[in-house]
A protein has these predicted regions:
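Anion-binding (especially nucleotide phosphate/pyrophosphate-binding) glycine-rich loop
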Residues: 1-44, 165-174
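C-terminal nucleotide
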Residues: 34, 43-53, 61-181
Length: 181
């Protein structure tokens, strides 16, 4: 039996399920005196996420396994981004639980129904991420914040937000945050 104690909210979009699976895989490997590579842990975590969420992107297992700041591209793996200074982040929790599997399914359905509208939004999200990498490399947190704001608007456009989250994002911006999503 495994008992988990965590201050990370469950079903809040913070990748806690991937983190738990990776941690348990590592712990069990130590108990059994079996060496697991990071690739092994990633594979186990990805399979677990597939069982629970259907067809997730793989970003949570990848970041959980390798840590740090990564540029993730589904099907192309990840690239480590060397960030020299700490980035001040605040995580707000609306208390609303959601299912990653249901969100993935909803976005997939919207892509099928409205591909000419949704696909460019998703492509813009990818371009936003690439611009964010440049902002991180240049230590330009103002631009990074603007890109977070753009990304949140894109997520809203495909239906991956809710009123309480939008209120939290707006309150963060009003309080002086460079960006929020």
């Amino acid at each position: 039996n495994v008992e988990i104690h965590s201050s990370i909210p469950v079903a809040a979009g913070l990748g806690s399920s991937a983190a738990v699976v990776a941690a348990v895989a590592k712990a069990v490997s130590h108990l059994l005196d079996v060496e697991l590579s990071k690739e092994d842990i990633l594979s186990i975590t990805l399979e677990s996420e597939r069982l629970v969420h259907g067809t997730p992107s793989g970003i949570d297992p990848t970041i959980t396994t390798y840590g740090g700041v990564l540029l993730f591209r589904k099907g192309r793996g990840s690239t480590r981004i060397d960030v020299k200074e700490d980035i001040p982040l605040i995580i707000g929790d609306t208390g609303i639980k959601h299912s990653t599997g249901e969100l993935v399914s909803m976005v997939r359905q919207r892509r099928e129904n409205y591909s000419s509208l949704i696909n460019p939004i998703i492509k813009a999200g990818g371009k936003t991420a690439l611009n964010a990498v440049n902002a991180l490399k240049n230590h330009d947190f103002t631009v990074l914040g603007e890109l977070m704001n753009i990304n949140h608007a894109l997520l809203c456009a495909i239906g991956v937000s809710n009123v309480p989250l939008d209120k939290l994002v707006n309150a963060s911006r009003a309080a002086g945050a460079y960006g929020a999503k």
